[in-house]
């Protein structure tokens, strides 16, 4: 049972703040070892045929970026063999389980483009038996071309180190942004924006046959334009996936169909199987508009029954009743059209992919991962529910005094919500919708979890996302834009500043043209 308490209060302060730092994390530090390497381009750099094909291919979403153009110019100058000697490292941005990430620039480049360079000590991760994870991340990054996924600009090796040059996100991660809100949580409107873009990114990954398995605010980064980018794919795995066309008649079948009735078939021999990646086309249909019927808001409390579905039970605290348009193909709210209602669309969900790996952050682990009975793409929808909960309420729902108690809570504890104060009927309704979505995502039985059969298309249709124009989601102004903050702070400065970066890390022309020097210790910051 999910308990909920929402109260009205006038003049409650907003949660949002435009102050944010570029890095904050709950992770432990990772220390790299020393290495020696020749400064020559031919000896320090190594690119496999797969790397050349994957990382140098045309990526339409990045073709006009300054960082992409600068990297293309570098490849032309050095004969495509990009190596460590071509970059100047400025500072460490953070560290993870298999590597550290550094801010860097191309030496001698006229552009002020910044990159994030992930450095993996292959010997260290081999000892920890995690080398396969590093290789899988490299392979997956080479496949991606999406506005909300990272771009892999270059990949090379030096000594026993592996280097991945990726997009730099100056806004930091959502965990850091959340901590800088007055109440350490986001408003519903901000949560809806970040959750919608994250959902589109997960949809793309699933259409590519990639199960992410590591969604959390620390892994959702903020680009300079305020839009999101997923990061850290070392826990992901790949499998075959075949997109299917979902008609209006199929959408009402919901979770009543059995596994044998599912029209999609996937296959994956191992968690890290290598298959030909799918180049998906995410459908953005433009149906004729129709008016949605007005909602009548009453008081109710949301409860979750034993079967894992949600019921609305009358109460004096929180409730709602809805009048729905039975055949509407789109819903209009505040000038924004929700085109996911009853329209034919393409979906691809790797529901038959299976892994028994115990991976992830404890507070975000799905019950099926903890039980060790095998898990598939439904784990991403569980973590998505935890992600929503933390964004709105400032904490995760099952956190215990230690990791062991946290795991027990995930398996056995009921879902509950803290008391929340709202100021208006609109906020009241939004909070009820948010809690209802979280309840349907945090169903312990993965087969009954929202999204387990038809993926993101089920989640997009939920009332929480009503009014979101999925086809034009990149046109919506984000709650916070690092680029605008930079322009304000550097007003009157003649320098061209493209990224949110402290002035002490900006390279002068002399520094950019300094001769390359290999340090005895890579981790010299």
Swiss-Prot record:
It comes from the Eukaryota. Gene3D superfamilies: Phosphorylase Kinase, domain 1, Transferase(Phosphotransferase) domain 1. Its EC number is 2.7.11.1. ATP binds at residues 93-101, 118. GO terms for molecular function: ATP binding; kinase activity; protein serine kinase activity; protein serine/threonine kinase activity. Pfam families: Pkinase. The active site is at 214 (proton acceptor). Residues 87-465 form the Protein kinase domain. Residues 1-27 are annotated as: Disordered. One of its GO terms (biological process) is auxin-activated signaling pathway. InterPro entries: AGC-kinase_C, Kinase-like_dom_sf, Prot_kinase_dom, Ser/Thr_kinase_AS. Keywords: ATP-binding, Auxin signaling pathway, Developmental protein, Kinase, Nucleotide-binding, Phosphoprotein, Serine/threonine-protein kinase, Transferase. It catalyses: L-seryl-[protein] + ATP = O-phospho-L-seryl-[protein] + ADP + H(+); L-threonyl-[protein] + ATP = O-phospho-L-threonyl-[protein] + ADP + H(+). PROSITE patterns: AGC_KINASE_CTER (PS51285), PROTEIN_KINASE_DOM (PS50011), PROTEIN_KINASE_ST (PS00108). Residues 466-525 form the AGC-kinase C-terminal domain. Disruption phenotype: No visible phenotype under normal growth conditions. Belongs to the protein kinase superfamily. Ser/Thr protein kinase family. Serine/threonine-protein kinase involved in the regulation of auxin signaling. Plays a minor role in the regulation of cellular auxin efflux and cotyledon organogenesis. This is Protein kinase PINOID 2. It comes from Arabidopsis thaliana.
């Amino acid at each position: 049972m999910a308990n909920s308490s929402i109260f009205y209060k006038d003049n409650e302060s907003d949660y949002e703040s435009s102050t944010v730092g570029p890095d904050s994390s709950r992770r432990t530090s990772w220390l790299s070892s020393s290495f020696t390497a020749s400064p020559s381009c031919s000896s320090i750099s190594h690119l496999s045929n797969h790397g050349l094909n994957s990382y140098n291919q045309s990526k339409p979403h990045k073709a006009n970026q300054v960082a992409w153009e600068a990297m293309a110019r570098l490849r032309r100058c050095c004969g495509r063999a990009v190596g460590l000697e071509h970059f100047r490292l400025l500072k460490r941005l953070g560290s993870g389980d298999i590597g550290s990430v550094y801010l860097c620039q191309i030496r001698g480049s006229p552009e002020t483009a910044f990159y994030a360079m992930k450095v993996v000590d292959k010997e260290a991760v081999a000892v920890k038996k995690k080398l396969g994870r590093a290789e899988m991340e490299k392979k997956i990054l080479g496949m991606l071309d999406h506005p909300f996924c990272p771009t892999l600009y270059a990949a090379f090796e030096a000594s026993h180190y592996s280097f991945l040059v990726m997009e730099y996100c100056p806004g930091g991660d959502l965990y850091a942004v959340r901590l800088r809100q007055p109440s350490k949580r986001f408003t519903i409107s901000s949560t809806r924006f970040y959750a919608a873009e994250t959902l589109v990114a997960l949809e793309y990954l699933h259409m590519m046959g990639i199960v992410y398995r590591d969604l959390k605010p620390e892994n959702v980064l903020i680009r300079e334009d305020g839009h999101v980018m997923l990061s850290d794919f070392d826990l992901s795995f790949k499998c075959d996936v075949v997109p299917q066309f979902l008609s209006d008649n199929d959408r009402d079948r919901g979770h009543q169909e059995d596994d044998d009735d599912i029209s999609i078939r996937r296959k994956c021999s191992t968690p890290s199987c290598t298959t030909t990646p799918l180049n998906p086309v995410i459908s953005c249909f433009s149906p004729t508009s129709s008016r949605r019927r007005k909602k009548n808001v009453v008081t109710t409390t949301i409860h979750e029954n034993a079967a894992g579905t949600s019921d609305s039970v009358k109460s004096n605290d929180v409730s709602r009743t809805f009048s729905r348009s039975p055949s509407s193909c789109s819903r209009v709210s505040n000038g924004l059209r929700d085109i996911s209602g009853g329209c034919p669309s393409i979906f691809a969900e790797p529901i038959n992919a299976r892994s028994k790996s115990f991976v992830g952050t404890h507070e975000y682990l799905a019950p099926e991962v903890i039980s060790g009975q095998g898990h598939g793409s439904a784990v991403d929808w569980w973590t998505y529910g935890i992600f929503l909960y933390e964004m709105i309420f400032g904490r995760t729902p099952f956190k215990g005094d230690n990791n062991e108690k946290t795991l027990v809570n995930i398996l056995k504890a009921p879902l509950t919500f803290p008391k929340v104060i709202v100021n208006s009927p609109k906020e009241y309704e939004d909070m009820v919708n948010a809690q209802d979505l979280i309840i349907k995502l945090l169903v312990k039985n993965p087969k009954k979890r929202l999204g387990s059969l038809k993926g993101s298309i089920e989640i997009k249709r939920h009332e929480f996302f009503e009014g979101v124009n999925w086809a034009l989601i990149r046109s919506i102004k984000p709650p916070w834009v690092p680029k605008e903050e930079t322009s304000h702070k550097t007003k009157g400065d003649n320098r061209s500043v493209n990224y949110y970066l402290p002035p002490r890390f900006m390279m002068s022309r002399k520094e950019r043209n300094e001769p390359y020097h290999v340090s005895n210790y890579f981790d010299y910051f």
